[in-house]
Amino acid sequence: MGSVRKASAWLGLVDDNDDERYYDDDYAEGQESGEAWVTDPRVKVASETAEEKGRRIGTVTPDSFRDARGIGELFRDGVPVIINLTAMEPTDAKRVVDFAAGLTFGLRGTIERVATRVFLLTPANTEIVSGEAAGRPTDGFFNQS
């Protein structure tokens, strides 16, 4: 097929029957062996592995210091916890933050302020991916200032 014909076929001006030469409708069907793929029982599908680990994040909005126990139990089980202290009195909120700081220190986790009076507690070996532009170049196409 010449280049003009290819261009015309690409634009849809002529029919492209070039592919029909290569297809054979009369192909021989082979005997199916009946063997199926056998997977190793130790191999697991990625979605099954994620469900087994129980990836979840706990959110707690405590009313008083008595709710600190629930925060501690979630964090002790390896669940990252978001604590929203906006509904608490400032003195009780300070006590909860002190408790959370001790909890994260004792279990080798981290505590991070996400917003005003909102904190994120992450257990050890948990990675936090930030959406900030720290790693992006400051100049380039997207810098239109």
UniProtKB/Swiss-Prot annotation:
Stored InterPro entries: Cell_div_SepF, Cell_div_SepF/SepF-rel, SepF-like_sf
Highest classification ranks of the organism: Bacteria, Bacillati, Actinomycetota, Actinomycetes, Kitasatosporales
Family: Belongs to the SepF family.
Paired cysteines (S-S): none
Pfam families: SepF
Gene: sepF3
Entries under HAMAP family matching the protein: SepF (MF_01197)
UniProt source species: Streptomyces avermitilis (strain ATCC 31267 / DSM 46492 / JCM 5070 / NBRC 14893 / NCIMB 12804 / NRRL 8165 / MA-4680)
Compartments where located: Cytoplasm
Subunit structure: Homodimer. Interacts with FtsZ.
Keywords annotated in UniProt: Cell cycle, Cell division, Cytoplasm, Septation
Name of the protein in its database record: Cell division protein SepF 3
Any one biological process term the GO annotation gives: FtsZ-dependent cytokinesis
